[in-house]
From Swiss-Prot:
Organism: Saccharomyces cerevisiae (strain ATCC 204508 / S288c)
Signal sequence residues: none
Protein's name in the database: Transcription activator MSS11
Coiled-coil features, chain-numbered ranges: none
Stretch list, region Disordered: 1-23, 191-220, 268-299, 322-355, 428-454, 587-681
């Protein structure tokens, strides 16, 4: 290509192979268009301004080399080709492109420098080769334009044009792999879901010359997809991988059902004779040797089918007879069918396939089975009997509800049987038949099964516990006394808790008796007295002046309304800063009439203290009552909570119905007081009380007998008593009023809103 005069003289060859050396031929003999060979202007990639001009230069060079003269002339007139010229060279002289470039003789030219308008310019390419990038792309464009897709190069060396062939052929049950041979008939093999492949489009990888049909690895490929010319084909051995089995699907279904029956239902096995007959049914027909004709094979298969049908009919007849006998001997279900769980297979979770249910004649063939309960057997036979008649749903095994321990299921059936026996016997059903097992027939027979021995022991244990539970009500009836306190009903429990809350509020000692004891009271010997409703007798009152005739009635705790309505109000009794005042009939042994208007709090019945007054000692002396007051004052000095003391009988008149209440409010801090001071304070308090009572008796004011003595403690420990007599009055409407200057009931403590509402 050093010669510029011979660059564009090669001709287009029949193939796409280009040689590096051009063909030297005359231009006038080829085309009417002439090159301006004497012109110094030519097309070259050396002086290209940009990539577009570089592309145009190569396209022009391609058109000239392949003798596309008209296209080259049109492209030269329209496209912006990079034109060059050589300066300083003789016209028509042989110059080298590389030498001219090195010497700086080349220059950029324009289309105005072209002398001949009809002639083509020569091309002088610095990078001109047959394997250039642009040349290869132009070859591809040419092949796409002409539609030359079936060339030998594309067919032999392009792997992308080969079709994708499936591994397994479509609809070939005879060539099913060995690991899919035991599938039930309702399971679709994976080959039936594959897309169909036609014979024309099937083409094996490669040319197929090394394809051996006798190889066991190639047995999945159907022989109709392979031509007889390609591969080594042995016609005699074709029966090895494609046997002619007309009843392959039926035998596979029977085989799978019977295998699952003996594999997963060990507890439901039948005797030896039906098992042998079913094992004969499992055996596949043995294929005769290949030299025997096909007619003999078909005859043998027909004979085997007839034998199998006869065996099935015999088994069905035997089973029907056995079921009829069982129906006459034992009635149909005693166990509730809804309470019996489904029994899943033991190994169904490992295979991942739901086992199919075998026919009914293969499940139960015996009347009695050693490893199965009679209740369970009767239930399954009942379900299968109604299933055949279309009355019951089919028996399905759940994979999730699997029993890991068969003893749990056996214990469930035994408990159901015992419950049914006890219910029927207690109801006096004359037509009832026991569903317990015959111990003499089952337990006396020696068995090597550990489960059978364990079941008999378990049944004995359950029966013993059941008999023991029967004797408990009889023992309860025979007992005359109860050692522990018995709460009869829920209301008495609430009342008992209400009584305990009252004691906690009064800071009194909690005992098992009904109410807190009075002073000098001896606790009864039997502290565990039951809190039960009943007639408890009239109370015994210590003070004869306050004694009333109380008729016997029901326990007052039954109709008592609870004092605390919610949790928050109940907690007020336990607050340390609380100074809680209780009504008198909760603290003393006296009885308050129900119609008394001076009581602020809700009143129980008159028999509120019957339980305590039965054991009290009646002391009517005034000295004993004074001693009681002194003891209560000692308790007030030691405790910071308010207490209530009952005055002596001399301080009240016989006509008064409400005793006097002396409330002592003490500071939180404990102070030590000498014995002499306490004695003096007691004497002063007693003298003042006696004087008050005498004045009231002289005046004859019965309404002013209701007074409250508030005795606060000062810093010196001396008790000062404020008597509120004149200001307290009995109102006309029956309410009790007090002077707010000396006694403010709302400032005593944090009263609960429930108490105020009541």
């Amino acid at each position: 290509m050093d010669n510029t005069t011979n660059i564009n003289t090669n001709e287009r060859s029949s193939n796409t192979d280009f040689s590096s050396a051009p063909n030297i031929k005359g231009l006038n003999s080829h085309t009417q268009l002439q090159f301006d060979a004497d012109s110094r202007v030519f097309v070259s990639d050396v002086m290209a301004k940009n990539s577009k001009q570089l592309l145009y230069a190569h396209i022009y060079n391609y058109l000239i080399k392949n003798n596309y003269w008209n296209s080259a002339a049109k492209f030269l007139s329209e496209a912006d080709l990079p034109l060059s010229r050589i300066n300083g060279s003789a016209s028509g002289g042989k110059t080298s492109l590389n030498a001219s470039l090195k010497q700086g003789l080349m220059d950029i030219a324009s289309k105005g420098d072209i002398v001949s308008e009809d002639g083509l310019l020569p091309s002088k390419m610095l990078m001109d080769a047959n394997d250039t990038f642009l040349l290869e792309w132009w070859e591809i464009f040419q092949s796409l334009f002409n539609g030359d897709l079936e060339s030998g190069y594309q067919q032999d060396h392009n792997p992308l044009r080969e079709r994708i062939i499936p591994i397994l052929p479509a609809n070939s049950k005879s060539n099913m792999p060995s690991h899919f041979s035991n599938l039930p008939p309702n399971v679709i093999p994976p080959t039936q879901n594959s897309f169909p492949v036609s014979e024309e489009s099937f083409r094996p990888n490669g040319d197929g010359s090394n394809f051996n049909l006798n190889d066991p690895t190639n047995r999945n490929v159907s022989e109709r997809f392979l031509s007889r010319t390609s591969g080594v084909y042995d016609k005699q051995n074709s029966a090895n991988f494609a046997p002619d089995t007309a009843i392959n699907s039926d035998i596979a279904g029977q085989q799978y059902a019977t295998i699952n029956l003996h594999k997963h239902f060990n507890d439901l096995q039948s005797p030896a004779q039906p098992q042998q007959s079913s094992q004969q049914q499992i055996q596949q027909p043995q294929h005769q040797p290949q030299h025997q004709p096909q007619q003999q094979q078909q005859q043998q298969q027909q004979q085997q089918q007839q034998q199998q049908q006869q065996q099935q009919q015999q088994q069905q007849q035997q089973q029907q007879q056995q079921q009829h006998q069982q129906q006459q001997q034992t009635p149909y279900p005693i166990v509730n069918p809804q309470m019996v769980p489904h029994i899943p297979s033991e190994n169904s979770h490992s295979t991942g396939l739901m086992p199919s249910v075998p026919p009914t004649n293969q499940q139960f063939n015996a009347q009695t089975q050693s490893s199965m309960f009679s209740d369970q057997q009767r239930f399954f036979q009942y379900q299968l009997h109604h299933q055949n008649q279309g009355q019951a749903p089919s028996f399905q095994q759940s994979q999730s509800g699997r029993f890991d321990d068969m003893n749990a299921m056996k214990m469930f059936f035994q408990q159901q049987a015992l419950q049914q026996n006890s219910l029927q016997q207690n109801l006096g059903n004359q037509n009832y038949q026991s569903n317990t097992r015959n111990n003499t027939a089952e337990e006396t027979t020696p068995t090597n099964d550990n489960n059978a021995n364990g079941n008999s022991l378990l049944q004995e244990h359950i029966r013993a516990r059941f008999n023991k539970m029967k004797t408990i009500p009889q023992q309860m009836k025979n007992q005359s006394t109860v050692a522990n306190p018995v709460v009869s009903d829920i209301t008495s429990q609430q009342q008992y808790m209400h009584m305990m809350m009252q004691r906690m509020a009064a800071n009194q000692q909690l005992q098992n008796s009904a109410f807190p004891p009075d002073t000098n009271r001896i606790a009864p010997a039997n502290n565990t007295m039951p809190l039960q409703p009943g007639n408890m007798g009239s109370p015994v009152i210590e003070n004869p002046g306050m004694r009333q005739t109380n008729p016997s009635g029901q326990n007052p705790m039954i109709n008592m309304q609870p004092l605390y309505q919610n949790v928050s109000s109940a907690m007020h009794a336990f607050a340390p800063q609380q100074q809680f005042h209780l009504p008198q009939h909760y603290k003393t042994n006296t009885s308050v009439p129900q119609n008394d208007s001076t009581s602020v709090f809700p009143l129980p019945n008159n028999n509120n203290n019957n339980n305590n007054n039965n054991n009290n000692n009646n002391n009517n002396n005034s000295n004993n009552s004074n001693n009681n007051n002194n003891n209560n004052n000692n308790n007030n000095n030691s405790n910071n909570t308010p207490t209530v003391s009952q005055p002596s009988s001399k301080c009240t008149s016989s006509s008064s119905t409400t005793p006097n209440i002396t409330t002592t409010i003490q500071p939180k801090r404990k102070q030590r007081v000498g014995k002499t001071k306490t004695k003096e304070s007691r004497k002063v308090a007693a003298a003042q009380k006696v004087m008050k009572s005498k004045k009231l008796e002289q005046n004859g004011d019965s309404a002013a007998t209701n007074f409250i003595n508030v005795t606060p403690k000062d810093s010196g420990g001396k008790g000062t008593v404020k008597v509120q007599n004149s200001n307290s009055q009995q109102q006309l409407n029956g309410s009790f009023s007090m002077d707010t200057e000396t006694f403010d009931i709302f400032n005593i403590g944090d009263f609960s809103p429930d108490l105020m509402d009541s």
